[in-house]
């Protein structure tokens, strides 16, 4: 059982356990020891977003890594996917990202990439933890002549800009497009405007003045209303909003309407199917994706495979099946032909390429998917029992599933952080599925708790 690492590395409030400098140093020491392999010099890349606490955590990690005889390459503020890309392109042994993604500035996190740019498997994280808590690490220190050095890599932003531009079709550019871009005062504040401008777009950039405390503060992908208003005000062709570490992206069309991750996947998957570029004709999404996505992809001759929630599970499924496109409704998109992890700017470029190739507006492209009506009811529970072991609940769910068949679905799952059961239904008739969701919620409430409908 892991104590430190969650689904996306180690997370917490800065300067509070486990996000303290003491623990960051221990994580650095343990990781450096585990990534060492043979007698040669080893190197670990470290990058971060724009949080105030990034400085202290970075210095602690650097000290820990160097103390175990491994060199550090510091790239400064850079999108999470940029750190993955530079780790593999510079042939480092691992990459470290200091970020809490879309969380407020008070939070921070530490996550690792392996030398090939993929997130670490659970067993590697477990080995790092075991070494930290074993108390053995002090006996593994190298002698004074073997400690590591730290180097600053000054051209990391430029390297990543060049890489991103290389993923955009050579026969296209962005001239004639006016784009509102919200960088969330985060890690992409230099990279994203440079990429779009160098490809010929007129860019109205907001959220590009980080001060250490304004990352994700009323800006970025969690606040699409901000770019929606800006698109209408500037009469732009579309809006693009990234989150703090730029691993996810949300769009708004020329009318200011949000275009979420499901629509982006539908646009890209159907376009790749037409070009015979979607491997195995398969898109990988999560159980949270709307069934309208399945319908759109199936109509275009493809299929959708669903995983548990979390981009790491999407990537695992893609690697296992040899697929090249996956993502989440929240805006994490993985184009494995180009990069190894969710990449907001890269995803934006792929959508812009479809727009330019077909000379269509984003609102027209988004019509490829019609979302099914969706209803979500939360039930407060006293215990997280498998609801299918409650006969009357299981019976009702079975009856409803028989009625919706292929034209809807029921998704029932517990919240990972609260004592809530989430009952989600999709179907063609909003009135009907609302009634069914309430029926399920009432039976659950009767058996295992008190209700909070939302």
Swiss-Prot record:
Cofactor(s) the protein requires to work: Mg(2+)
Gene Ontology CC entries for this record: cytosol
Q: Which domain of life is it from?
A: Bacteria
Note describing how the cofactor binds: Binds 1 Mg(2+) ion per subunit.
Q: Does the keyword Phosphoprotein apply?
A: yes
Functional note: Catalyzes the conversion of glucosamine-6-phosphate to glucosamine-1-phosphate.
Q: What is this protein called?
A: Phosphoglucosamine mutase
Name its species. Answer: Geotalea uraniireducens (strain Rf4) (Geobacter uraniireducens)
User: What are the top taxonomic ranks of the organism?
Assistant: Bacteria, Pseudomonadati, Thermodesulfobacteriota, Desulfuromonadia, Geobacterales
